[in-house]
Each structure stands twice: as structure tokens, then as C-alpha cells.
């Protein structure tokens, strides 16, 4: 019963494991799922260990009961193989749909397994190792009724082809079984021993899938999803017996960037390139060495040959036909005063290439492996991989100062194109858009260190001193019209020449940013000691800009730079205007605030003055009232005084006895006006 409970627990854990594997396929980068998967694997491993111990205990109990008769008959090997083949054609049922077998049958299987292990001869068991299959796999996951084979199988059967491959191990490690082990049929109902020389003891426990494949029945393969953990947890096996992985494209070859369509299948047409006539005065060295360079299918072959001091004329003709099989060398004619034509043949030149000094190109640095479909897709979109980006960034340092001693100068494939001048389009004889930098491989040239004018044919100046040093003629087949050799400015990526515009020699040259001319630092007037930083314009372009005689064909990058400079200038001007406007507004605001302060102070002063004026007005009114009263008093005093004077005068005239006269009694009483005046005078005196 303990074995049955362990099997049920393993069944549940395996179902959960399969669900986790399905989730991991949808989201392989989820860390939580990985953690749960590792924990579940640890649980399954622990349960399998417990089951192993229970099986070993049952095996010991069965060994004690060896005297009991065997309840199952061992069938021959051929019958078991036939049953294996017929049973493997049936699909595997899910784990939850299979019926568990009885514990009595499991005990019988353990008993049978113990008897088989006891019946094995010592010669076989000493040299063979066992592969233990947990009984949970057989009783719960496989609906196959397969009989076990005898351990003492004949040796002739061992050499046959494998019949079964059995598969998933602990921690998702695949069990590697040799062909001899696979030849012996596996008893899938019992924990049997599969004997075979060279097979190591591996405990196979189903963690996520069980795969059975037979080569004889390929039409119905059994596909069960599998999950492969990270490489640090699963060491990759050296040999997988019946597992055939999906063929992977070979990507261990360094992948070069996809060439343009015109370079996909270059064909070398019969085209004599140039006839160069050298004199001893034009050769710089005393040995008169000529270094011709031939480019065939992207490989360079440099040949150095020494000639005596004599006038030399040679013609180099490419072989007619299609693409050449391998790199070929150029034959140089012997020194003579007559013209000699040399044709290169593949058979003869292969023998001569061994004796000549061929300088192969340097071995390319190993690049990162890339998918060719991915590269083609990126190239079609105009994208660049990391390796090509590093190449472009490293080659940007060579832009200002590069050596042109080697005429086969190849630049970056993905470098942005620049505009071509009208002269370049007129001199170009090839279809534009074939190469970025350097010379195309279909032109073969014998180049010397003499004065060579690449852009102008010699017939235009027959009497010039340069024509005496260099004579260049071109011969083409009959239907083709004779044209001039394409100048170094005929390529799209680099519109600059390869020779100094002053001395007509190669070397370390400084390129003008506005035209195709190049100069030595020493040939300039005044000569430069270091490379100038930023944009450099040659003297001729400076003169043209000053005179405004011709329109200079600006390259695209320079036009972008100038437009950006103009844009920045406009932005700066607008910024300055806005700053000035803001400063003016701030100043005006400050002035207004000052005016507000002044007005507020003046208003406060006015209010104070108003209050003071009102107070003074009140005081003045009170004082005016007092003055009016005083005036009234003064008027009242003046009215009372005449009456008193008359009375006193009458009294004096009457006599000293002051008796009034007789008619005094008859005088009327004083008028009320006089009485009022006296009253007022009395009041005025009282106020005083």
C-alpha cells in the first residue's frame, strides 16, 4: 500500500510538472516558473528515492520467498520484440485516463524480477550494469503489456539494430543507452534489469515525458512535449540513440555582409585594361620595381618583379569567359622596346603561381556567428550588426588621413553615401551603385609609381610634359567603343582621387570636404604639419567660393552639416531675440512696479495732506467764528457809546447840583434800541 500511495503522489506531481512545462514553453523567461519547476523536480526526486527504497525492501522480501513457483512464464526474445513493435504503434494515453493495476500484480512483478536477477549467470552480471526503471512509469503511464526477456540472451541477437529508445531521467537528463543495451527488450511492467555491456547504472524516472520510438514504424511517431532546463543543469549527452533533432543551419562560418545585387555573380569579361609606358625618369627607385595588383573574386595577388633600366611597355589582358576558378596572377612581359601582349591561361598560371611571390590577404578577425536570414533581413532594412558597427567606427578614424599605397582600398560597406558631382557622372562608365569604396574587382590594373593621370586621357594634351612620361591606351573588342578608364571618383562611397592634385603621387593624403581633390600635407601652400580639425577646404575650393565663378557640388553630408549650422544659427538668433525681449519685459515690469510704489506713496501723502488740511480747515472755521464774534462785539460797543456821551453832556449843562431841568421829567424814557445796545455792551464786557 505504501508503494501505491507513493505512485499516486508521483502521478500528481508529474501532472503538475507537465502543466508547468507547458507554461514554460509559453513564457520561458519567467523566473517564478523556473523556481517552481526546480522545487517540483526536487519533490519528484525525493518521491522516486522513497519509491526506490520501498522497491528494494519488496525485493528483499521476495528473495526470501524464492522457493515459491513462478507465476509468469518467460517468453522468448522474438515474441517480446514482436509485442514491442505492435504495442508501440498505439498512442500513449494520458496519465489520468489509465487504470492502476493491483498491488498483487506489482508484487508478482517484483518476484519475477528477483527471479530473473537470480537466474542470470555470473559471467554476464559481472560485466554488465543495470538500468532501473521505476515501476510507476510502467504501471501508470504505459498501457503496454510486455513480457520480459531472459537475461541469458544469445550473443547473436546483440548485434541487431536497436528496437526501443527509452528516455527521460531524473533532473531531465536523458538516459544514453548504447546499441547493445537497446537490442535487449525492456520489461516495462517490472523494475527489470536491462543487460548490456557498457551501459551505466541509471535510474530512469519520468519527469515530464516518456518517448518510445521504433525505426521500423516511422509513420506514427509519438510526440510528447519536453522541457529542457538551462545548460548549467543538464549536461548535453554525447550520443542520442533514437532522438533526431531538427537540422540546424551551419552558422559557424563567418558571415560577410550581403553584397549588392551587381556583385552577387561577378563575371570577368575580356577587357584589356591599360598600357603603361615607363621610362627610367618616372620610376622612383633605382631597381625600377613595378607592383601590379590583380583582384580576382575578392582576393588580391601582388607580384613584384625587377626590370633593368630600359623603356618598358606591357599590356595586361584578362581571360575571356565566366568566373575564374581561383586566384590568378598577372604575367609581365620581359623588358623590350616593342609592345608584347601576354594572355593569362588558367593552366599555365597555376604552375607559375607557385614560383611567384603571392601575398595573400591577412586572415580576417573571427566575427560573431549570425543567422544568414537575419543578416539578409537587416541588410534589406538598412540595419547594421554589432560587428559591422564596430568596423565602421574603427574606420571613421581613417577618413581624414588614409594611405593609398595599396590601390585595393576597401572601406565600410554600410558607410553612408555621399553625393556625386556632375564630373563624376560624366567620367563614370559603370552602372552606379555597385560598390562603396575601392576599385571593383572587374578592373585589372598595372600600377606603377610614375606620374599617372587617372581622370584625363593623354590624347587631350599631346605635347604636355606629363604625356612624355605616361602614355595610356585602351583596346576593347569590336562592338565596344573605346572609353577612358574609370577614374577613382567613379565609385559611390568615396568620391576622392587616389593621387595628390599637386605632385600626382600617392601616399598619405588629406581629402577636401567639398570636392574630390586630395593633397599631401607638404604640397600645400603653406604646408601643414598636422591634420586640421573639423571641415577642411582645399585652396581651389576657397578661390571658387571667393570668386563665385562656379557652383561647388556640395556633398550630402556637408549640405546636412550646413543646414544644421543654419538651423542652429536661426535657433540661436531666435533665442537671443527672446532673451532680449524677456529682459526688456523684466525691465519694464520693474519700472512699473517702481511707479506703483511711487504712486502708492504719493497717495498716502495726499491722504495725510487731506487729513491735515481738514484739521486746519476746522481750526480756521473756529478762529473765523471767534473773529466774527469779536467784530460783533466791536460793533455793539460803537453803537452804545454815542448815547452815553449825550447823556453825560446834558448832565453837565444842567448845573452842578445835577438836578434835572423842569422839562427833564417830561423827557421820554430811553428807546429800546439804546437799551439793547447797553445790554450788548454789558455782554461784551462780561465775555471779556
From Swiss-Prot:
Keywords for the protein's UniProt record, in alphabetical order: Chromatin regulator, Coiled coil, DNA-binding, Isopeptide bond, Metal-binding, Nucleus, Phosphoprotein, Repressor, Transcription, Transcription regulation, Ubl conjugation, Zinc, Zinc-finger
PTM-bearing positions, type Phosphoserine: 456
Role played: Component of the BHC complex, a corepressor complex that represses transcription of neuron-specific genes in non-neuronal cells. The BHC complex is recruited at RE1/NRSE sites by REST and acts by deacetylating and demethylating specific sites on histones, thereby acting as a chromatin modifier. In the BHC complex, it may act as a scaffold. Inhibits KDM1A-mediated demethylation of 'Lys-4' of histone H3 in vitro, suggesting a role in demethylation regulation.
Annotated coiled-coil segments of the chain: 571-609
InterPro entries reported for this sequence: Zinc_finger_PHD-type_CS (IPR019786), Znf_FYVE_PHD (IPR011011), Znf_PHD (IPR001965), Znf_PHD-finger (IPR019787), Znf_RING/FYVE/PHD (IPR013083)
Biased composition (Basic and acidic residues): 336-354
Known DNA-binding region: 434-446
Stretches annotated zinc finger (PHD-type): 497-544
Modified residues (Phosphothreonine): 453
Protein name as it appears in the record: PHD finger protein 21A
GO cellular component, one term: histone deacetylase complex
A GO BP entry: suckling behavior
Self-association state and partner proteins as the record states: Component of a BHC histone deacetylase complex that contains HDAC1, HDAC2, HMG20B/BRAF35, KDM1A, RCOR1/CoREST and PHF21A/BHC80. The BHC complex may also contain ZMYM2, ZNF217, ZMYM3, GSE1 and GTF2I. In the complex, it interacts directly with HDAC1, HDAC2, HMG20B/BRAF35, KDM1A and RCOR1/CoREST.
Major localisation: nucleus
Keyword Phosphoprotein appears in the UniProt entry: yes
Biased composition regions of type Low complexity, renumbered to the chain: 85-127, 660-679
Record Pfam families: PHD (PF00628)
Signal peptide: none
